[in-house]
Amino acid sequence: IGKFGQWYTDSDLVKQDTSALLLKNDLPEGDYRVDTYKIHDNIGMWLDKSCLQYFGSTAAPSILSFYPALGVKRDVRSEPELSNYALRGLLSVEYLITTPEKQTDFENEADDGWEYAFAKDGYAVYRNTNYVPMGFAYDYYLTQTEYEETAKATRANLLIRALVLTDEDAAVYGKYLTHLPEGRREELYYESYVQDCRER
């Protein structure tokens, strides 16, 4: 689940991994993903939680196409920047974990959607106030063509608001949803993202 420590960059690897095993019992129960900030890879595995920051030698083709479609680099490492705030709500990230030494850096870089939750087991934990539970439902849809016309940097915002259907699927299933009005495809700001998360 880990890797061999390297003398300078990984000197605290064992400590972080064993602390994560303790933190596993102190995290709130529930089905959610976690995110990490400037700590070692794959901490989520020790927590039995899916984690946005991940290193693995295999990845499903759908993941390798999903992330780049949102303007996020994805190869064997998943490491979306904090500036991709809408990705956290879209992928149901409820908690972010960092070390006390990195707290100030995180708070300076993060958007307003994070609140300090607690410190325990050598970690500082933040709660995503824009958390959207897994399995949320949609009221709106847009077509694949409309989706692809949107700037990559705002597509995660759009996916919080509407489901993407191929033209063929829209002809069959579009009757169950409302076609997203053109004006709502352009209001893709942080404030509108917060409202969209509340509506989910």
Model-derived features with residue positions:
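Residues that form generic nucleotide/phosphate-binding pockets
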Residues: L23-D26, F66-A69, A153
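Luminal/periplasmic acceptor-recognition loop/helix of membrane-associated glycosyltransferases
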Residues: L52-L91
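Short alpha-helical segments and helix-capping/turn motifs at coil-helix boundaries
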Residues: K15-D26, E79-N84, E101-T104, D111-D112
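Active-site-proximal structural scaffolding
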Residues: L13-D17, L27, P80-E81, G89-L90, ...
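Charged, low-complexity surface segments at secondary-structure and domain boundaries
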Residues: G2-S11, K49-Q53, A69-V76, F136-T150, ...
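Flexible, solvent-exposed extracytoplasmic
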Residues: L87, S92, T98-R200
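Extracytoplasmic
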Residues: I1-Y54, Y126
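Positions that flank functional sites
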Residues: D41, A59, Q103
